[in-house]
C-alpha cells in the first residue's frame, strides 16, 4: 500500500485448500469457523490490543521512544488520577499474566498504551485491532506518534485435516468480518447455518443465499433512526461481510 501511495489499512482473513488440508490465516479481528454436522471448529483467533497486550507492552519496553513521552506502557484497572500518586494500585506489565501492585508515580498518569476492554479496547487510543495490513501513515491524533510500529502483519495459521473427518453435504466454512461476530456468537451462527441449509436443500444458490441471510441477521431491522436485532438489542453498526464455502465435493473446483 505504501509503494502505491495508498493510505489506510485493513485486516486480512484468507483460506487455502491444498492437498487435503484447509489452511486459514488471520491477521486482525475477522473470524472463520467450520460448521459441521455435530460440531463447530474455530479456525482463527482475533488479534486485538487486549489479546496482544503483552506483545505490545514489550515493544514499548524495548523502544520507549515510540511512546514519545505521551503514553504509559502499564495497564491499570481504571484511569489513574492525581490523588493516586504515592498509593499502591493494581497494574500489569509485559511480563505479567496476572495483576501485581505498584506505587503510582506521576508518569503513570499518562494515557495507557492499551486501554479498554472487549470491543472498546484501543491501541494508543486509536485502533481496535493489533494486526493487519497498511496503516503506514497512521498517527495518534494531534501527535507525531506512529501506530504502525505496534501493528503486526504476521497472521496466525490454523490447519484442518480433512482425512481425519467425515465431511457431510451441509458442512461449511464461514468467513466473516467482525460486523457479524459483534452481534452473533459461533453457536448462533451455526444454528442459522444448519436450519437454513436443511430448509433449502434443493436450492442451487443456497450457500450464497445463506451468506445474505447471515448479513441480514446481523444488520437487524430499522426501528426509527436505529437498526435493531429486537426491542432491546442494537444490531451491528460495523461493516458486515460474509462468505459461506461448502466443504463437500471440494475436489471438484
Please name every model-derived segment.
Residues 1-253:
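PP2C/PPM-type serine/threonine phosphatase catalytic core
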Amino acid at each position: 500500500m505504501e509503494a502505491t501511495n495508498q493510505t489506510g489499512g485493513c485486516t486480512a482473513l484468507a483460506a487455502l485448500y491444498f492437498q487435503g488440508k484447509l489452511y486459514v490465516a488471520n491477521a486482525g479481528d475477522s473470524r472463520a469457523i467450520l460448521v459441521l454436522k455435530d460440531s463447530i471448529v474455530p479456525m482463527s483467533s482475533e488479534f486485538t490490543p487486549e489479546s496482544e497486550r503483552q506483545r505490545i507492552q514489550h515493544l514499548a519496553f524495548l523502544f520507549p521512544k515510540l511512546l514519545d513521552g505521551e503514553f504509559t506502557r502499564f495497564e491499570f484497572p481504571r484511569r489513574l488520577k492525581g490523588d493516586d500518586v504515592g498509593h499502591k494500585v493494581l497494574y500489569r506489565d509485559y511480563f505479567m499474566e496476572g495483576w501485581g501492585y505498584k506505587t503510582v508515580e506521576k508518569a503513570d498518569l499518562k494515557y495507557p498504551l492499551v486501554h479498554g476492554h472487549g470491543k472498546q479496547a484501543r491501541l494508543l487510543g486509536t485502533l481496535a485491532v493489533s494486526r493487519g495490513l497498511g496503516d503506514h501513515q497512521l498517527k495518534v491524533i494531534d501527535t507525531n506518534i506512529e501506530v504502525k510500529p505496534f501493528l503486526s502483519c504476521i497472521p496466525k495459521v490454523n490447519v484442518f485435516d480433512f482425512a481425519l473427518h467425515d465431511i457431510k453435504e451441509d458442512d461449511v466454512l464461514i468467513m466473516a468480518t467482525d460486523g457479524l461476530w459483534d452481534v452473533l456468537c459461533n453457536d448462533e451462527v451455526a444454528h442459522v447455518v444448519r436450519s437454513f441449509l436443511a430448509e433449502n436443500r434443493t436450492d442451487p444458490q443456497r450457500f450464497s443465499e445463506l451468506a445474505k441471510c447471515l448479513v441480514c441477521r446481523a444488520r437487524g431491522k430499522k426501528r426509527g433512526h436505529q437498526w435493531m436485532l429486537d426491542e432491546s438489542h442494537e444490531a451491528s453498526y460495523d461493516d458486515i461481510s460474509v462468505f459461506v464455502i461448502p466443504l463437500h465435493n471440494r475436489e471438484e473446483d
